[in-house]
């Protein structure tokens, strides 16, 4: 755990992000139960690592309340960084993404999983065009997803819950912006996360109704469109 003196030292060393951690006693919780407690937050995710085929890795990583994002559609990039939204054209979206993400620097701390904050998301199949010029020159095909599915979408994870599957322990992390949060304010953010996941789950007993009549399924694509 970082002390106040270490926090100030890291901030003075030009680190823009300082990870603060706290191990909490959440006996009986699982990655799924922890995720259910934050699932109503904005932009959430649960990452499970796998090593060597079917063998589960050590950590389950839960992120939530992700505010910053990078969205790439064609050569148009939309960003929301520190509450400021922008949209601009880029001839090289991958370089633009690298330029944005490289602005954040954080110290390497012992006892942390390999991922404890940063950008997560997806690179769609079509994003290969940004790295391979031959693909970019191919004629574009119409797609039902084209209007609402970007080629790249990344969100910045600053608040995380790390569940250790080997030790059955829970660690919470707040990646503090050293220019916006003091040490005391960062500890208060950890307090909020701890309170959130220690809140008991409310289980509703829904009365399910048996469907009447036959169910008809319809594909979103015709065979010709596929």
Task: Name these PLM-found stretches.
Residues 91-109, 133-146:
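Short acidic (Asp/Glu) patches
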Residues 1-44, 49-87, 125, 129-226:
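Extended accessory regions or peripheral subdomains of proteins
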Residues 105-113, 200-206:
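Short, flexible active-site-proximal loops enriched in glycine and acidic residues
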């Amino acid at each position: 755990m970082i002390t106040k003196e270490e926090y100030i030292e890291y901030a003075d060393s030009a680190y823009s992000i300082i990870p603060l951690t706290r191990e909490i006693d959440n006996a009986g919780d699982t990655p799924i139960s922890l995720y259910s407690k934050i699932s109503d937050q904005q932009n959430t995710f649960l990452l499970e690592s796998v090593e060597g085929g079917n063998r589960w890795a050590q950590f389950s990583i839960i992120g939530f309340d992700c505010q910053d994002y990078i969205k790439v559609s064609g050569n148009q990039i939309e960003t929301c960084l520190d509450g400021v939204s922008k949209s601009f054209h880029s001839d090289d979206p991958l370089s633009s993404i690298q330029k944005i993400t490289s602005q954040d620097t954080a110290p390497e701390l012992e006892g942390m999983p390999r991922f404890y904050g940063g950008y997560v998301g997806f690179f769609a199949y079509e994003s290969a065009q940004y790295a391979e010029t031959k693909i970019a020159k191919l004629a574009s095909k119409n797609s039902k997803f084209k209007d609402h599915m970007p080629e790249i979408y990344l969100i910045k994870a600053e608040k995380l819950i790390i569940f250790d599957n080997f030790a059955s322990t829970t660690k919470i992390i707040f990646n503090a912006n050293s220019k916006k949060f003091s040490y005391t304010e960062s500890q208060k953010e950890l307090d909020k996360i701890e309170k959130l996941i220690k809140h008991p789950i409310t289980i509703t007993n829904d009365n399910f109704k048996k469907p009447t009549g036959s169910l008809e399924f319809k594909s979103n694509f015709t065979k010709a469109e596929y």
